């Protein structure tokens, strides 16, 4: 799993995460694909680090929307998408 993979899966979520549009089905599909491809602890930590890094570099991200995204898509992930998340603690 690479940050490129994460970015590809999450690209359709950007407008929603900026509060600039509705939640597209493609975004939830990306969230589900990402969860399904992160099968090991290392993959989950990589995905976490990539998500946190991307959320800091994309301007205008609403972290409330980001944190709620997995639940809105019906997916459970073992960490919060937040700048303060310590990805090294993800199992």
Swiss-Prot record:
PROSITE patterns: PLANT_LTP
A Gene Ontology cellular-component term: extracellular region
Short name of any one Pfam family annotated for the protein: Tryp_alpha_amyl
InterPro entries assigned: Bifun_inhib/LTP/seed_sf, Bifunc_inhib/LTP/seed_store, Plant_nsLTP
Entry keyword annotation includes Transport: yes
GO BP of this protein: lipid transport
Example of a GO MF term: lipid binding
Gene3D superfamilies associated with the record: Plant lipid-transfer and hydrophobic proteins
Annotated S-S bridges: 3-50, 13-27, 28-73, 48-87
Localization, UniProt: Secreted
Keyword Oxidoreductase: no
Signal peptide bounds: none
Keywords: Disulfide bond, Lipid-binding, Secreted, Transport
Family in the record: Belongs to the plant LTP family.
Role played: Plant non-specific lipid-transfer proteins transfer phospholipids as well as galactolipids across membranes. May play a role in wax or cutin deposition in the cell walls of expanding epidermal cells and certain secretory tissues.
Protein name: Non-specific lipid-transfer protein P3
Source organism of the structure: Vitis sp. (Grape)
